């Protein structure tokens, strides 16, 4: 018999967020922990139009940002082991995340996510967008999703 690789449905990735982050408060805490891991001195959480269809949550930090390699190897890798081997931040903080699934907390907060990141000492930034409803489409696998824009 030939070797058959695993295929992961996009729906599974969405379920990771729903099972690990039971409510919006837990999801926000997870994202604030990410700002800590990025050595941000400050984290601002702004709520806009809460209770309406245009509700928006902004989580703004001043951390180290991500370059394209970090986005590909860490942010876009489900279950990354990066924090197992890089347990301290550049400023010596013990990193709080360990499972490599924190980005799925975003799914708990709304149907659409946009993330902007600018790596330290760089003039080039990245924009990451996702429509979480796309993860529910039948037959879509994780490898079908390409979500990063430069």
Give the role of each language-model region.
Residues 1-148:
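GHKL (Bergerat-fold) ATPase N-terminal catalytic module, capturing the glycine-rich phosphate-binding loop
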């Amino acid at each position: 018999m030939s070797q058959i690789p695993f295929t992961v449905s996009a729906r599974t990735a969405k379920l990771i967020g729903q099972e690990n982050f039971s409510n919006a408060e837990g999801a926000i805490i997870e994202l604030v922990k990410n700002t800590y891991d990025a050595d941000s001195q400050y984290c601002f959480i702004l709520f806009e139009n809460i209770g309406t269809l245009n509700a928006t949550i902004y989580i703004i930090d001043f951390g180290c940002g991500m370059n394209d390699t970090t986005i590909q190897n860490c942010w876009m890798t489900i279950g990354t082991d990066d924090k197992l081997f890089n347990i301290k931040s550049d400023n010596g903080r013990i990193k709080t995340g360990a499972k490599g699934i924190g980005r799925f907390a975003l799914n708990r907060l709304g149907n659409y996510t946009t993330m902007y990141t600018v790596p330290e000492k760089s003039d080039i930034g990245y924009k990451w967008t996702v429509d979480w409803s796309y993860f529910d489409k039948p037959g879509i696998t994780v490898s079908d999703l390409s979500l990063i824009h430069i």
